[in-house]
Regions:
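Single conserved hydrophobic/aromatic residue that forms the stacking wall/gate
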Residues: 1-7, 11
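Active-site mouth loops of central-metabolism enzymes
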Residues: 12-16
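Active-site pocket-lining segments that scaffold enzyme catalytic pockets across diverse folds
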Residues: 19, 24-27
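Acidic, PIN/NYN-like endoribonuclease modules and their adjacent C-terminal/linker elements
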Residues: 37
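Thiamine diphosphate
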Residues: 40-144, 155-176
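Flexible glycine/proline-enriched surface loops and loop-helix/loop-strand junctions
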Residues: 150-153
Length: 178
């Protein structure tokens, strides 16, 4: 959606959520694969990727998609597919939230120690777990920083607004190669 500035129709602005901006950033970052399992509040990030990939990741001659987006049967399958895509040279990612990170931790260690580039979007909920909206905290930060068993230190990016979501998403795919 575009809206006009109150002062003039010359200035146009894009209204976009952080999740949709991250999905668009993933497309600009070169992502061609997304695997995800529906979990609030991250589902709209994968949907944003699909929306923009349909526009920007299509062969102009044949009309065939140059991307894949898979709704997995669970969080383990979602991260496993993303690891497999990256292992085979694609730029793939998954999107989840805190409980999904907990379930993905063993595979996150596999990617880390096998040095397989991987981007995981953790769209954090307001509380420490499901059903805890009155006690907010940032527990996902440590869960992500040291995800898996062993001595892991993952790169974490913390966007503050939709512009950061776009920029950090696009850059995350390059950072995953470090």
């Amino acid at each position: 959606r575009q809206v006009s500035s109150a002062a003039s129709d010359v200035y146009k602005r894009q209204l976009i959520s952080g999740n949709e901006a991250a999905g668009l950033g993933a497309v600009y970052g070169g992502a061609t694969f997304c695997s995800w399992y529906p979990i609030t509040p991250s589902t709209s990030l994968a949907e944003g990727f699909e929306k923009y990939a349909k526009k920007y990741r299509v062969n102009e001659t044949t009309g065939k998609n140059l991307y894949a987006s898979v709704q997995a049967e669970d969080e383990l399958a979602a991260v496993g597919m993303a690891i497999g895509a990256n292992w085979n040279g694609a730029r793939g990612f998954t999107a989840t939230s805190g409980p999904g990170i907990s379930l993905m931790s063993e595979f996150l260690g596999l990617a880390y120690f096998a040095e397989i580039p991987l981007v995981v979007f953790n769209v954090q909920r307001g509380g420490p777990s499901t059903g805890m909206p009155t006690r907010t905290q940032q527990s996902d930060v440590l869960a992500c920083a040291y995800a898996s068993h062993g001595d892991t230190k993952h790169v974490l990016l913390f966007p503050a607004d939709p512009k950061d979501c776009f920029d950090f998403s696009a850059k995350a795919f390059d950072l995953s190669l470090i």
